[in-house]
Amino acid sequence: MASYTVESFVAQQLQLLELERDAEVEERRSWQEHSSLKELQSRGVCLLKLQVSGQRTGLYGQRLVTFEPRKFGPAVVLPSNSFTSGDIVGLYDTNESSQLATGVLTRITQKSVIVAFDESHDFQLNLDRENTYRLLKLANDVTYKRLKKALLTLKKYHSGPASSLIDVLLGGSTPSPATEIPPLTFYNTTLDPSQKEAVSFALAQKEVAIIHGPPGTGKTTTVVEIILQAVKQGLKVLCCAPSNIAVDNLVERLALCKKQILRLGHPARLLESVQQHSLDAVLARSDNAQIVADIRRDIDQVFGKNKKTQDKREKSNFRNEIKLLRKELKEREEAAIVQSLSAADVVLATNTGASTDGPLKLLPEDYFDVVVVDECAQALEASCWIPLLKAPKCILAGDHKQLPPTTVSHKAALAGLSRSLMERLAEKHGAAVVRMLAVQYRMHQAITRWASEAMYHGQLTAHPSVAGHLLKDLPGVADTEETSVPLLLIDTAGCGLLELEEEDSQSKGNPGEVRLVTLHIQALVDAGVQAGDIAVIAPYNLQVDLLRQSLSNKHPELEIKSVDGFQGREKEAVILTFVRSNRKGEVGFLAEDRRINVAVTRARRHVAVICDSHTVNNHAFLKTLVDYFTEHGEVRTAFEYLDDIVPENYTHEGSRSHSCAPKPKCPTTSVRKPASAQESRQEARAATGHSRRKPSEKPLGSQVQPQHSSKANGSDRTGGTDRTEHFRAMIEEFVASKEAQLEFPTSLSSHDRLRVHQLAEEFGLKHDSTGEGKARHITVSRRSPAGSGSATPQPPSPPSPAQAEPEPQVEQPVGQPHGSTQLDLKALHLERLQRQQGCQAQSQLGGGSRPQKAPQKKKKKEPKGPAMALPSEEDFDALVSAVVKADNTCSFTKCSASTTTLGQFCMHCSRRYCLSHHLPEIHGCGEKARAHARQRISREGVLYAGSGTKDRALDPAKRAQLQRKLDKKLGELSSQRTSKKKEKERGT
């Protein structure tokens, strides 16, 4: 064995662990010194105002204390937090700053948390059910000590069952040739060829085998088959993973195969479905179970007596009795543990749970024949060495193309701490030790193809059973635009939906993307998709909090988490919000390619990505994702949602609430009132010059070319140019004729109709699009005369460069972020708003040439021609005056009251109304007002009565509790005085 290699490796790992440990301690210290308790709770590292709800004795005599939120009730839950089983926590009294005790968190649910305290705190820890406490997450000394101990053991390891394995893993020797094994009879007959090959390969290898399982390829199924085949050969297997969830997943699968399995770890840390296989449960079924139970009961009784007595001599006797009982308990439990371990075919534990500090210290050094480490790519290499030293062979399973091990120290991560054992061996030995599973059973083929090309060298394929499945194929789900596509990109580029800039730059948020997510989820739910089948993934905790505030009340089953919380999970639909949108093009946390791979591959049937393409395209890997979605998916711009989302930096004219009765409209908008958000998005596409392309459609001459096409003016566009000229000729002929209207056939495509809309606008004609689906058609008609102008529209003269409008640029492919012919969506939208404003002003000026006897009110009712149709010599000052006058008039339909002196501004639609119509429920903003009130209540957690202030009266329950506490205290003082008085009387 190359001792120098071992020594240098151990020295490097210890140095990296020390950096990580120091960074973790410094982070905790900084939080405690510079953050308030509420800030710590918002960070997820502190739980406030807890009460003791129960105490009992657990395994090895540990004291288990259950804490719950102070206010009891069915709806009271713990706040969002980052506590997990195994965390070291500090216990504090709410009214004191000193720490009462240190314990290990063994179980946490939405409503309670259980902490285990060792025997050293038994007599110092006196917890009162009436008091309130807080728990603070501390740096995990236990894990650090176990990792350090394993590395030091490796350094001193000279002879033993793992000697050859250590040589191979540290580069002292090459892997031995595979041995010949007889043909296998598989327990699982549905394994695909790549899975069967991986099983045979793992069993044939002498020292090490790596099973590379990309998302959805059945890695756990393959690992279970390997374990069963090893047990069949008479081998003793130790199976580990870095997390309790991963270990419990294997326990559930192995339990179905009726093998003797034993799960190490306290049952409070395990899933309920596997607790029967825990060491504690097995011991409870053993011959010594009743004796052990009697000893524990005796310990609890002695604790009770010790708590009641005040005599020091009796307390000392009780302590000695407890020590003797614990000694007997330990001896009987160890004998039962050895018996249980020997009877098991497979022993399962976390990496750190397999240390010599636990039950495995009772077994011989060479007891196990093979060690299996699942999810190895997520584990620190130092943690893997804890179980690896217990057997001559190891089988590693995982995916090093997904999330790496979690670290706090950026310096340690760059120096190699975040590089897993699996990744290091795969790069060093390649195919000699690695077999990859090539068929996935989760994702639609469009999702699979991107992951395969981006991360897995094109080797990953979709099984036919999932290759074409979509959301619309689920029971009860309708066929809509959202449910019929596997890939959807909502691009916020140029829409003003910028990220929130935090001072500490620790986390980012994007309220605009939150609103887009909300609208898309509502569209999916309206189509019949269950909220529990949808996941929202964000890379930043601040964005996760914003999403939960907006969505959790309405959709409680909806899962909203960070990327790290979703590895190993899957959902029918996944919505990704990338958050980053800034002028510098900084992507920050998104630069981790493996993080994006995990996020995208959580979806089975539908992935929606919401991002700013201008920002994310500055990162090469993210640009490949955007380009792929553009080529194979459906692309929308956030402008399609402008009826529901208005960027904060837009003026109020752009927010035309569809809940109000419409004012006269300019011709760029449809004359029909939108019946749904989907229809309003279609109108927005027509107004901004965008049409969408579904992945199944080929780019034809009459359709917009996909973004990836480079033939903007080539032969592929000839057909589109010819059709435009054909439509232009038809409209010119109509203008020259005396016909009142021109109807176009229903056979026109959506883009053909867009061309007709644009041409009609050029000629100053009225253009209406009516009908639904295949019955949709366009009618072009003449406008009413404006002022003294002619009723016959004139063909437009060629515009000068200064007058040129951006409409002809609509042929530019959608979504290209760079290029000289880039279509500026924001400029188009602002121009549309300007035209709408001009239309409104013209409606105020249009009656100037009518007889004086006509009433002024009558003139305001009649819509006039658009601003674009006004003569070029129109007095600009008059136009401005008209706009100002319109702005000082009540925005409610059929109301001409002035709002110059007495008017109210509506925060929901950004308009002014007179006192008769200023209430949101009257002028059409009632729903928005109710939504705002709900959001405020959800955010502040306080229900306000009208516009009054918060009721600061003492809560009746709290008052009653304090009264009971006072009465109890008075009773105790009274009894003490009575007893002293009696003693005094006896003395006399």
Curated annotation (Swiss-Prot):
Tissues expressing this chain: Expressed in liver, skin, muscle, heart, brain, spleen and kidney.
Residues found modified as Phosphoserine: 797, 800
Residues modified as N-acetylalanine: 2
Residues of the R3H domain: 721-784
SUPFAM superfamilies hit by this protein: AN1-like Zinc finger, P-loop containing nucleoside triphosphate hydrolases, R3H domain
EC number: 3.6.4.12, 3.6.4.13
Motif Nuclear localization signal per record, residues: 857-861
Protein residues bound to Zn(2+) 1: 890, 895, 914, 917
Purpose of the protein: 5' to 3' helicase that unwinds RNA and DNA duplexes in an ATP-dependent reaction. Specific to 5'-phosphorylated single-stranded guanine-rich sequences. May play a role in RNA metabolism, ribosome biogenesis or initiation of translation. May play a role in regulation of transcription. Interacts with tRNA-Tyr.
Protein name: DNA-binding protein SMUBP-2
